Design a protein with these regions (language model features):
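Conserved NAD(P)H cofactor-binding loop of Rossmann-fold oxidoreductase domains
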Residues: 1-6, 33-34
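Short-chain dehydrogenase/reductase
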Residues: 7-11, 41-53, 83-86, 109-110, ...
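Conserved Rossmann-fold NAD(P)-dependent oxidoreductase catalytic core, especially the SDR/UDP-sugar
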Residues: 12-48
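Hydrophobic pocket-lining residues that define ligand/cofactor binding sites across diverse proteins
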Residues: 21-24, 60, 123-127
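Active-site beta-alpha turn of Rossmann-fold NAD(P)-dependent dehydrogenases/reductases
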Residues: 30-34, 71-73, 137
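Active-site proximal helix/loop that lines the substrate pocket
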Residues: 34-38, 74-77, 125, 141
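NAD(P)-dependent short-chain dehydrogenase/reductase
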Residues: 50, 54-108, 113, 117, ...
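C-terminal substrate-binding subdomain of Rossmann-fold SDR/epimerase-dehydratase oxidoreductases
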Residues: 100-103, 109-214
Length: 214
């Protein structure tokens, strides 16, 4: 669920997990996945995500396991070493250089862990009958260029560039299901949370400086 993350062993892990629940008619499984299956372009990762979702559906139907699929924007952390932002902060501090693999106009699709935690509580508290596919909408509309401008304020010596000729992907549209059925919507914007993420990173890595020297 991390941006630019991998899915190594995902299908096999799902198979083992679902096999464990086979035969238990009261089992409930919530499979949380990223937005990749909704993208119009086809890549190796989008194919893997779609396959994992379909595997959950088919296995659940075959063995009568209540499966819900929750598609969310990418998660972020300042303390998880494999996270996109942990690596980004390390790069900008050590190299004073960031090259985004996205176009400046590409919107960023991210969700705060605390927002996800609130949603999970509401889903399990009001599970309902049958299987379903739920989608966390993209409600904070800001681009990589705006994000880069925010980073430039934090790291004034950093050189920030973008790939201008890449495909721009749309975010998850709001079907209002989560708001109407669970009374939930994302509350925390990544841009507002960025300073705290960086402080978490500094605490994790014992990095004392809050800004790159000019």
């Amino acid at each position: 669920l991390t941006f630019h993350g991998t899915m190594e062993g995902e299908i096999e892990t799902l198979r083992k997990l679902l096999h464990y629940y086979k035969g238990n008619l009261n089992s409930r499984l919530l499979y949380i996945t990223g937005p990749d299956s909704l993208y119009e372009d086809t890549t190796g990762k989008t194919l893997m995500v779609r396959s994992a979702e379909e595997f959950c559906r088919q296995y659940g139907e075959l063995h009568q396991i209540a499966v819900k699929i929750l598609r969310v924007p990418y998660l972020y952390s300042g303390t998880y070493e494999e996270d996109y932002f942990f690596k980004l902060f390390s790069t900008v501090i050590n190299k004073k250089q960031i090259t985004f693999e996205e176009a400046p106009a590409q919107e960023m699709h991210f969700l705060a862990l605390s927002d996800l935690g609130d949603l999970l509580y509401k889903i399990f508290d009001n599970w309902g009958e049958g299987s379903a596919c739920l989608q966390v909408p993209q409600v904070f509309h800001f681009t990589f260029q705006q994000f880069g401008e925010r980073l430039a304020q934090m790291f004034p010596a950093a050189n920030i560039t973008y790939l201008s000729d890449v495909l721009i992907r749309d975010g998850i549209s709001d079907d209002h299901v989560l708001r109407n059925e669970y009374g939930w919507f994302p509350k925390i914007s990544l841009l507002e949370d960025l300073t705290e993420i960086y402080e978490d990173y500094c605490e994790k890595t014992n990095h004392k400086t809050r800004k790159i020297d000019v």
